[in-house]
Amino acid sequence: MLGDNLQPAALVQVFEDVICDDYYKTNSLPPASDGALANPCKAQPIQKELALVRGFQQLVPIFPSLLCTVPYGLLAERIGRKRVLIMSGAGVFSALSWVLAVCYWRFASIRWALLSGAFLFLGGGDAVISTILHVMVTDTADDAERAQIFLYLHAADVISGFFGPAISGPLMEKGHTWIVLLLAAATLFSGAFLLTIFIPETLNLRKRSTDDSALLSDSTSPETTDSPRSELPTPTKLSNSIVGEASNLLSPLLSVLASNRQALLLLLIFSPQTGARELFTLIGLQYTNAKFSLSYARGNVLLSLFQGAQGLFVLAILPLITRLVADRRGWSAWARDRLYAIVSIAATALGLMVIGIAPALIVEAFGLLFVAVGSCSTGLLMSLLGGAVRPSQVSAVYSAAHMLSIVVRSVIGPVLSALLVTGLELGWNWMGLPFVTMALLMVGAAVASSFIRSERVANFDED
């Protein structure tokens, strides 16, 4: 988590430097008297290329996510969650290493950095990591604890998001942008190969209820769960088994989505949440730099504010509201999470709209605070989704949720980056176009969330 949150501002700065150098190798520098271009790297062609590269970089994970999430999820059922988690971390580390190699040695165009997605086929990338972590929580926690643990995971993410920019900002101010990126790479390496040693394997801890045993018959057989040191299948048998189990898993999943309208509704609402929350990280620094002339290094302050507000809300304010209001009124976990999710999505929509139309930097900061309030919607919706299906279907719908989220985020990235380019071309008043567009999408999600059932039902296949 910390490795990811150290990168955003430093990567934008390095990308801009590389694009700027490449551009002026074939184009003359602007006249020194041109006050509008005191920094030659702020020329529109350079900023346009930067926005497009950053946007298409979000498209990179879509193919590994689509092709690998289910197979690696099934592989985790056979060889263990922990081993797949290590593989996924190794793939993410390798992808970042490729980007840094392209930018440092410059042996190819900056667009070659987009090939980092090929390394994500090792382990499946962030989608598999997120899915495995959620399944590990489901292995060990009951319904009452699940939502709280998901919020704690989100809190860990936002806390690292606070310290990441707080660390990178001062280093970038002193010109140590590459030190920040090397620190990020070292952190990812530690997370992939060192910290995972201390994470227990949860495959054998799964409660062996009738519903759980129906998830994947092979994954709960004595050969794979009761005897952790049993002989592993050969690669050929494992490959054939994964293909067969993928087919067996997708068929019930499609059946669930066709018959369980609540699960389908929750999946559709969940899909744009991560993209909305990460929009400022994706294009916010470039947007703020263009609109309010705030440097990327100092833009880390906004990222720290954003992440710190998320942590404060998730760790302190939301639990306090739960104790003072929800618990005293006797709300069920489902009713509580439903209301929180609706309010969170509405707050995100409001915050994005404020950022998009902000006339001053302080107003943009207030918009970020509203988005921070809405940032817990992902954990809340995942909890609702887990409660809307049978226990035997949780792993499948979680995989579907993360795949859908990655796909939507990957598609939204280039689209909103293109809107940022359009806004830059149209002028100051239109620069917030991508934020306003995303705000309208979240308004639709907020309206849709009002159709979530007010109470959990026993018959999961009811419409």
Q: Which residues does each PLM region occupy?
A:
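Intracellular juxtamembrane helix-capping segments at the cytosolic ends
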Residues: 10-11, 124-142, 284, 376-390
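Glycine-rich segments within core transmembrane alpha-helices of 12-TM secondary carriers
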Residues: 145-173, 187-188, 310-313, 402-415
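Multi-pass alpha-helical transporter architecture, strongest
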Residues: 189-203, 355, 411, 421, ...
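Cytoplasmic helix-loop-helix junction between adjacent transmembrane helices
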Residues: 116-159
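A membrane-interface helix-boundary motif in multi-pass transporters
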Residues: 173-188, 333-339, 415-442
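A late C-terminal transmembrane helix in Major Facilitator Superfamily
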Residues: 391-425
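C-terminal ends and interior cores of transmembrane alpha-helices
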Residues: 85-109, 342-359, 364
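Juxtamembrane intracellular "pre-TM" segments in multi-pass secondary transporters
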Residues: 202, 206-275, 290-291
